């Protein structure tokens, strides 16, 4: 069967449902596709189709994720939903499913629960820019004061983790009512109201091509008579021939000029996000550039050695460690294209980290890496992946 053509006429946004187990994330995902299918913006995907999500591998970690797509009048959405709590943790930390925003689902009957808190914290740590709340199962709560109480609790919890709890839209409804065509106010209409909130409150992400230029260095060649060529895939932005760039990471930052861009052996006047290019650098010797550095727009990225991270440590079954590790653990941290040794400092009160845990930790690298918040990395021992992480904040 041929795939339907992906119409690129609307801005695209990646979102996902997060929240405690059994609060209705998957039912809500199904309900959104059902309600939007009426206007031709989606294909109805039933609960059991979403729930048996296929397994995917991201950075050597197996994650089950369901993907649905739909559109509103304003945007095209790719929506991810995970069957299990561990899948959420892995998904958010590896960035396997990039989230420009999230729909936090909270059962009105139960209020915020441990995973509600953990998913909000994870969203904060991994840099999900905005959340919208769907207060689900409102048809099970008769007392309006109780609903208000739950809403207040959710807002307080969001504020505690530095989300704007007072401003975040909270939509009250019932995913089940929408799926079973009952109580349109809590069902059908609430879903439309939720999508309106998602449309307006979750900011449109900046496209990679509009961001400042950055390209991780994969390989370096010397071409006699022409100079040094650096190859890699442009991560974001545009590099034009004649522009000044910086080489950042592993050693002192150097400024140089890009005197040529090649792709498939053809000369171009620019390379852009997604392109695999060779960049010719003026006056740069081959030994001055190495894999693991980045080429970038001057001043846009700085080299750092100390940062706070959120990490997931693989289980033995996932091919990870068989034993716990302690503070001063020294694995390699794989950033973009290279491994750098670093020392792990565990937070106060955390004695050790077991395989299968996710943990906030501080890392001190032995050499600097071009780094910014939200940058993903793998934790490796002798080339074997034992964990995945994301830079939560930079210390120095």
Swiss-Prot record:
Where are the residues of the annotated region G2? 60-64
Keywords for this protein:
Cytoplasm, Elongation factor, GTP-binding, Hydrolase, Magnesium, Metal-binding, Nucleotide-binding, Protein biosynthesis
* PROSITE patterns per the UniProt record, alphabetical: G_TR_1, G_TR_2
Q: Which GO terms describe its molecular function?
A: GTP binding; GTPase activity; guanosine tetraphosphate binding; translation elongation factor activity
Q: Where does Mg(2+) bind?
A: 26
Q: Does the keyword Cell division apply?
A: no
Q: Does the keyword Protein biosynthesis apply?
A: yes
Annotated compartments: Cytoplasm
| Binding residues annotated for GTP, in chain numbering | 19-26, 81-85, 136-139
Region annotated G4, chain positions: 136-139
Q: Which domain of life is it from?
A: Bacteria
Any idea of its EC number?
3.6.5.3
As its record notes, the protein acts as a catalyst of: GTP + H2O = GDP + phosphate + H(+)
| Pfam families associated with the record | GTP_EFTU, GTP_EFTU_D2, GTP_EFTU_D3
Q: Where is this region: G5?
A: 174-176
Domain tr-type G, residue spans: 10-206
InterPro entries cross-referenced by the UniProt entry? EF-Tu_GTP-bd (IPR041709), EF-Tu_GTPase (IPR050055), EFTu-like_2 (IPR004161), EFTU_2 (IPR033720), G_TR_CS (IPR031157), P-loop_NTPase (IPR027417), Small_GTP-bd (IPR005225), T_Tr_GTP-bd_dom (IPR000795)
Q: Main role?
A: GTP hydrolase that promotes the GTP-dependent binding of aminoacyl-tRNA to the A-site of ribosomes during protein biosynthesis.
**What does the subunit section of this Swiss-Prot or TrEMBL entry state?**
Monomer.
Q: Which family does it belong to?
A: Belongs to the TRAFAC class translation factor GTPase superfamily. Classic translation factor GTPase family. EF-Tu/EF-1A subfamily.
Under what name is this protein listed? Elongation factor Tu
Q: What organism does this protein naturally occur in?
A: Rhodopseudomonas palustris (strain BisA53)
The top of its lineage is: Bacteria, Pseudomonadati, Pseudomonadota, Alphaproteobacteria, Hyphomicrobiales
Q: Which gene encodes it?
A: tuf1
